[in-house]
């Protein structure tokens, strides 16, 4: 969807009684956080989810800052999701994580800790030196993981509050995935 159509489409979705609206962060299209802010600002009650931002393209501290800001602006209406990202797009940017699942795990746990008010100083796949959010969310945010394979789905069941499945997922895949989460 073109960015200039987001607010109108979100309003229409709310007027038609949709229960939620989800944005993906597909590289080289429209930025998800700006689109989500436009959708939230154009609606009164419609929850909006991020399904998903890449754990590799955005540092967890920046993700936490964006998530906390949206949560404070629109309490109870923003649901963040994290995933690896499309491998081809990551390769286009020269990003090749040695352990994709470790990247998603570390990003998710760091995001949760930062949103909870912790100050992080640690070295791992992501480095932190006395990083702490200034403006914390006023409520605990549910964190979703967008995963596909069995190990990723297992990770989602371990560290996330919910799982985002592909828009292309069929009934059989959903059954298969639920057994692994």
Describe each region flagged by the PLM:
Residues 1, 25, 50-54, 82-84, ...:
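A cross-domain feature marking catalytic cores of carbohydrate-active enzymes
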Residues 1-4, 53-60, 137-148:
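Active-site mouth loops of central-metabolism enzymes
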Residues 1-50, 141:
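N-terminal beta1-alpha1-beta2 module of alpha/beta enzyme domains
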Residues 4-8, 34, 61-65, 158, ...:
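Generic recognition of short, well-ordered alpha-helical segments
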Residues 64-181:
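Internal, glycine-rich beta/alpha segment that forms the wall or movable "lid"
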């Amino acid at each position: 969807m073109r960015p200039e159509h987001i607010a109108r489409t979100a309003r229409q979705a709310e007027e038609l009684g949709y229960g939620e609206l989800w944005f993906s962060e597909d590289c080289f299209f429209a930025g998800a956080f700006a689109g989500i802010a436009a959708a939230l600002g154009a609606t009164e009650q419609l929850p909006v989810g991020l399904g998903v931002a890449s754990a590799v393209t955005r540092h967890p501290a920046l993700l936490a800052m964006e998530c906390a800001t949206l949560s404070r602006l629109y309490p109870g209406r923003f649901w963040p999701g994290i995933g690896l990202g499309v491998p081809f797009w990551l390769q286009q940017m020269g990003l090749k994580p040695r352990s994709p699942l470790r990247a998603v795990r570390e990003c998710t746990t760091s995001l949760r800790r930062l949103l909870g008010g912790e100050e992080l100083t640690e070295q791992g796949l992501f480095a932190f030196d006395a990083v702490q959010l200034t403006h914390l969310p006023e409520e605990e945010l549910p964190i979703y993981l967008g995963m596909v394979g069995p190990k990723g789905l297992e990770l989602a069941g371990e560290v996330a509050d919910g799982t985002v499945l592909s828009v292309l997922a069929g009934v059989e895949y959903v059954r298969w995935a639920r057994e692994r989460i």
